[in-house]
Curated annotation (Swiss-Prot):
Topology relative to the membrane: Peripheral membrane protein
Catalytic activity: a quinone + NADH + 5 H(+)(in) = a quinol + NAD(+) + 4 H(+)(out)
Family matches, as InterPro entries: NADH_DH_suC, NADH_DH_suCD, NADH_Q_OxRdtase_suD, NADH_quin_OxRdtase_su_C/D-like, NADH_UbQ_OxRdtase_30kDa_su, NADH_UbQ_OxRdtase_49kDa_CS, NADH_UbQ_OxRdtase_CS, NDH1_su_D/H
Cell compartment(s), UniProt: Cell inner membrane
GO CC list: NADH dehydrogenase complex; plasma membrane
Family membership noted in the UniProt record: In the N-terminal section; belongs to the complex I 30 kDa subunit family.
Role of this protein: NDH-1 shuttles electrons from NADH, via FMN and iron-sulfur (Fe-S) centers, to quinones in the respiratory chain. The immediate electron acceptor for the enzyme in this species is believed to be ubiquinone. Couples the redox reaction to proton translocation (for every two electrons transferred, four hydrogen ions are translocated across the cytoplasmic membrane), and thus conserves the redox energy in a proton gradient.
Descriptive protein name: NADH-quinone oxidoreductase subunit C/D
Organism expressing this protein natively: Acinetobacter baumannii (strain ATCC 17978 / DSM 105126 / CIP 53.77 / LMG 1025 / NCDC KC755 / 5377)
Residue span of region NADH dehydrogenase I subunit D: 210-595
Start and end residues of each stretch annotated as NADH dehydrogenase I subunit C: 1-186
Subunit comment: NDH-1 is composed of 13 different subunits. Subunits NuoB, CD, E, F, and G constitute the peripheral sector of the complex.
């Protein structure tokens, strides 16, 4: 063992839960030198020696009922973490979150690193989507992945100094000198945006002709946000392309380190600003997992209803703009009018439209208003007829069919390799929907179907979105008909302040109330994560608590980060016009990609 390798503690007792069977398979293959970490989750977290991580990952990728998807990969600076009893010594920890559809289970592999030797072998030879995840870990933590084909910054500019998710890097702007940009600095920054093909391994031409390089974005209507993709063109054919992200990066994971558990909620629905309350869900449920909070049944159903309202709103926008990018102008205007009906309901319930920040740890901010049923019933009566009109106007339109059929097509194997979830995966015939596979918030009590298509092309992706609107209406109808009575928030000291009369009678209760309200509640030490089906795919908040009022580390796995990474594998060899259709049918919000 090298001096900088980390020794494993003694092996841990066998866990009998089905998801932990893979641990015994690992021990059978590699011996006992693994450490299984106790977390609040229902799947194993296994520490592996750095020297064996490649073969362990390869084994998990090829084992019977394999872990076909690298769902997430990131790191954590552990140098200031106080409550890590029994864990392997580690300055920086890299984790690999793997997903198996056949097992319907996950495993998290962790590797401990010494701060003087932040080197790991790349996993891009096992899962191609490790490329961007490893670049992000390099960008944010300075971890070097040996053998990576293009290890460079991804969210921050190339000239950036430091690695922001390290603990010595301040989270507050007041810790730095004011930002001033003069002409020289502007020229310097603009020069670093210049695309040099050789830096990306691209050739300027071949023996017969020169290629043209075209910047699409970062301010282009078809990019659907602050996103640049550089195209290597031979005429109209895309020979290769380089997606360039980070223009919308706000450092939301760093922000979480200086917000209390409650005050971070408004930041979550700004990750995907079209997702609204659906974006609150994985965060609050991860915190509830940490705190052991049981959410009342009424609050669970209210959450489901709000989630599905925002799913409808997102999908109406998606379908309208996708059809518009294919040349159909009419549907988008009607769909925007229908979205206002959904916003009216959301505003009546939450008080806001786009950024309600309405879910709370333990439930919701308040109960449903009087006569909420009337607005919901009006939507349920209105939308089915409109959907029939949209289907006829768009999905039977020969122009739309011609522009989307067999365009930007990929199969299920490719989707899994690139970490695609949501409608992009279901358009290839795989019905993975977290609401069905791993029901949460009472979804197991609802009768709904998971729409799938099998062609994996642009038409299939739009059609799956459209069919999901029908299923969301079906779920909302069940919420309307079966809304339980009872409290809308858990009566738990980490979720709500104590009753007012008790604070006036008992000094200890008053002190607890004062500390909880002024400083925020202290969550138990440990780790928890929760996966939900947000409007664009599967999203996870992975939280590390150091028994403090704020998160020690918040990892946000968003679906669209890896969806954009897939672009070159799908579009190379196609036409520029096909790329426009592909971008329109990915369903992307750049704040969700860049965080």
């Amino acid at each position: 063992m090298a001096e900088t390798d980390i020794a494993m503690p003694e092996s841990t007792p066998v866990d009998s839960r089905p998801a932990f069977a893979i641990v015994e398979e690992l021990k059978t293959k590699f011996g006992e030198n693994f450490y299984v970490q106790a977390t609040f989750e229902e799947f194993p977290t296994v520490w592996v020696e750095r020297a064996r991580v490649q073969e362990v990952l390869m084994f998990l990728r090829k084992v019977e009922r394999p872990y076909v998807m690298l769902f997430d990969l990131s790191a954590m600076d552990e140098r200031l973490r106080q409550h890590r009893d029994g864990l392997p010594a580690s300055d920086f920890t890299v984790f690999y979150h793997l997903l198996s559809l056949e097992r319907n289970s996950d495993i998290r592999i962790k590797v401990a690193l010494n701060e003087n030797d932040l080197n790991l072998p790349t996993a891009t030879n096992i899962w191609p989507n490790a490329n961007w995840y490893e670049r992000e870990a390099y960008d944010m933590f300075g971890i070097n992945f040996e053998g990576h084909p293009m290890l460079r910054r991804i969210l921050l500019p190339t000239y950036w100094e430091g690695h922001p998710l390290r603990k010595e890097y301040s989270a507050r702007a007041t810790e730095y000198t004011p930002y001033m940009q003069d002409k020289a600095k502007q020229d310097f920054e603009q020069e670093h945006l210049r695309f040099v093909p050789e830096d990306w391994g691209l050739k300027r031409g071949n023996a017969d002709e020169d290629f043209m390089f075209l910047n699409l974005g970062p301010n282009h209507p078809s990019a659907h946000g602050a996103f640049r993709i550089v195209l290597q063109l031979d005429g109209e054919e895309v020979k290769d392309c380089v997606p360039d992200i980070g223009y919308h990066h706000r450092g939301v994971e760093k922000m979480a380190e200086r917000q209390t558990w409650h005050s971070f909620i408004p930041y979550t629905d700004r990750v995907d600003y079209l997702g609204g309350c659906a974006q609150n869900m994985p965060y609050v449920m991860a915190v509830e997992q940490l705190a052991g909070i049981k959410v009342p049944e009424r609050a669970q159903v209210i959450r489901v209803m709000l989630n599905e309202l925002f799913r409808i709103n997102n999908h109406l926008l998606y379908c309208g703009t996708a059809i518009q990018d294919a040349g159909g102008m009419t549907p988008v205007f009607y769909m925007f009018a229908d979205r206002q009906k959904v916003y009216d309901i959301v505003e009546a319930i939450t008080g806001y439209r786009m950024h309600p920040a309405w879910f709370r740890i333990g439930g919701t901010a308040h109960d449903l208003p009087n006569n909420w049923q009337k607005l919901v019933k009006e939507l349920l009566d209105w939308m089915p007829k409109r959907l029939n009109e949209y289907y006829t106007a768009a999905f039977k339109n020969s122009v739309f069919i011609g522009r989307t059929r067999n365009v930007a097509q990929y199969d299920a194997k490719s989707a899994l390799a690139w970490g695609v979830t949501g409608t992009g995966l279901r358009a290839t015939g795989i019905d993975f929907d977290v609401r069905k596979y791993r029901p949460y918030s009472g979804y197991e009590n609802f009768d709904f179907e998971v729409p799938v298509e099998y062609e994996g092309d642009a038409y299939a992706r739009v059609l799956v979105h459209f069919r999901e609107i029908e299923q969301s209406l079906k779920i909302i109808k069940q919420c309307l008909d079966n809304m339980p009575s009872g409290p809308y928030k858990a009566d738990h000291p980490l979720a709500v302040p104590p009753p007012k009369d008790k604070t006036l009678q008992d000094i200890e209760t008053l002190i607890t109330h004062f500390l909880s309200v002024s400083w925020g509640p202290v969550m138990p030490a440990g780790e928890a994560s929760f996966m939900t089906e947000v409007v664009k795919g599967a999203s996870t908040y992975y939280l590390t608590s150091d028994k403090a009022t704020m998160s020690y580390r918040t990892r946000i796995r968003t679906p669209t980060f890896t969806h954009l990474q897939q672009i070159p594998s799908v579009i190379n060899g196609s036409l520029v016009s096909d790329l426009i259709i592909y971008l329109a049918t990915i369903d992307v919000v750049m704040a969700d990609v860049d965080r």
